[in-house]
């Protein structure tokens, strides 16, 4: 069946071996999985968030810190039975608080099949849809059963930046529509992440302004200072440097000015704040693919 899961709507017949923009194939590919304690507090609880890092991505961020698996496709193809085993172990052995689907969009049909199998066994946990925000509302509607929590980015407020930095046409309208869908569906279960990018703090502020005006300043926001130059960003100004303290403070001050009271900031200048949300800082006891 032609794939139209993401906004690109490539219509690649993946079951027959064709691939689209994301290069995802006919089977789910996973890079790493396990309990993760670096997510936002409501998702972590006592036993951590059960993160499953899927390979491939619907965007191509030139500064991607996860490029080995998002761009390069590192990971292992697995059957739905194997994928179900991962989710079962996370729930029953690790006793995680939720199943955290990191960049799941190309593999949603397989994840749903896994969920149905586990539900038949009496195994149920909330799903976290952990995404860049570059999602079709039609796909969100179709797979809403996999979105108990929406952990969505608002990365850009200008499409020209999104196209240059992430090869994501129409990102602004698309990500805002996704955030609006999640907010209207369940106001208790949306967290918006805003990664402050070097030279683009004004876009983070514009995203906050849109949230406050079009949704609500009650939306929980996670303001992230962790940007670190990586991959092609190391050769592409202004992405070849970190965020300055002045840039980050301008965003946190704007959040206060807009009346946001729910959410989190990252300590600027703390020891390795950049690691707080990265998969490579997660315990790899049973999730590393060599």
What are these regions (language model features)?
Residues 55, 60-97:
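Glycine-rich active-site/cofactor-binding loop and its immediate structural neighborhood
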Residues 30-50, 85-104, 265:
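Short Fe-S-cluster ligation motifs
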Residues 55, 77, 130, 241-242:
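Residue-level marker of alpha-helix boundaries and capping positions
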Residues 1-18, 187-189, 194-290:
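Auxiliary Fe-S-binding modules of radical SAM enzymes
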Residues 79, 106, 270-271:
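Positions that flank functional sites
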Residues 2-58, 62, 66-71, 279, ...:
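N-terminal [4Fe-4S]-dependent radical SAM core
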Residues 84-238:
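Conserved AdoMet/S-adenosylmethionine-binding subsite of the radical SAM
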């Amino acid at each position: 069946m032609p794939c139209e899961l993401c906004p690109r709507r490539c219509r690649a017949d993946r079951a027959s071996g064709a691939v689209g923009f994301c290069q995802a194939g006919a089977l789910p590919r996973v890079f790493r999985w396990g309990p993760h304690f670096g997510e936002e507090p409501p998702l972590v609880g006592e036993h951590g968030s059960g993160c499953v890092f899927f390979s491939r991505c619907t965007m191509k961020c030139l500064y991607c810190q996860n490029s080995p698996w998002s761009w390069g496709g590192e990971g292992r193809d697995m059957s739905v039975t194997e994928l179900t085993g991962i989710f079962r172990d996370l729930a029953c052995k690790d006793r995680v608080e939720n199943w955290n689907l990191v960049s799941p969009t190309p593999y949603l049909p397989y994840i749903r099949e896994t969920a149905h199998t586990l539900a038949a066994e009496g195994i149920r946990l909330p799903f976290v849809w952990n995404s860049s925000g570059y999602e079709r509302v039609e796909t969100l509607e179709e797979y809403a059963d996999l979105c108990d929590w929406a952990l969505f980015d608002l990365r850009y407020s200008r499409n020209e930046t999104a196209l240059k930095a992430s090869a994501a046409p129409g990102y602004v309208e698309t990500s805002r529509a996704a955030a609006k869908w999640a907010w209207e569906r369940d106001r208790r279960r949306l967290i918006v992440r805003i990664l402050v990018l070097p030279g683009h703090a004004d876009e983070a502020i514009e995203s906050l302004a849109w949230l406050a005006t079009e949704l609500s300043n009650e939306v929980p926001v996670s303001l992230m200072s962790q940007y670190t130059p990586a991959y092609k960003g190391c050769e592409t100004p202004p992405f070849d440097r970190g965020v300055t303290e002045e840039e980050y403070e301008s965003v946190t001050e704007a959040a206060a000015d807009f009346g946001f009271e729910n959410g989190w900031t990252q300590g600027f200048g703390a020891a390795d704040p950049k690691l707080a949300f990265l998969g490579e800082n997660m315990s790899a006891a049973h999730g590393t693919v060599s």
